[in-house]
């Protein structure tokens, strides 16, 4: 178990996800994409690999933006998505609190399996 997952609070992550992320993302197997992709199976696919979702050009490019999602990359991304991937379609400004990010990552690690 990573340090991020260990310090994350899944219940608070669920609340944060529902309040800040669920309007654009789903997490259940087979759920449709919304404004953002369904995050089921999130950890360790390349960032452009969710079927049926039209990714922004920076997400589709090879090299730097071909991200392997894990606890640390997601934790870093959620601080400021537009800084992490310039020109991403994701409108969310990010979670500035490290604890909030750890909580959401812990929730997603559990809910997207």
From Swiss-Prot:
Pfam families in the cross-refs: Cytochrom_C
Keywords, ordered alphabetically: Electron transport, Heme, Iron, Metal-binding, Mitochondrion, Respiratory chain, Transport
Principal subcellular localization: mitochondrion
Protein name, as recorded: Cytochrome c
Subcellular location: Mitochondrion intermembrane space
Binding site for heme c: 21, 24-25, 90
GO terms of molecular function: electron transfer activity; heme binding; metal ion binding
Biological process terms in GO annotation: mitochondrial electron transport, cytochrome c to oxygen; mitochondrial electron transport, ubiquinol to cytochrome c
First and last residue of the signal peptide: none
One Gene Ontology cellular component: mitochondrial intermembrane space
Changes after translation: Binds 1 heme c group covalently per subunit.
Organism for this UniProt entry: Dictyostelium discoideum (Social amoeba)
Gene from which the chain derives: cytC
Free-text function comment from the UniProt entry: Electron carrier protein. The oxidized form of the cytochrome c heme group can accept an electron from the heme group of the cytochrome c1 subunit of cytochrome reductase. Cytochrome c then transfers this electron to the cytochrome oxidase complex, the final protein carrier in the mitochondrial electron-transport chain.
Gene3D superfamilies: Cytochrome c-like domain
Family: Belongs to the cytochrome c family.
UniProt keyword Electron transport, yes or no: yes
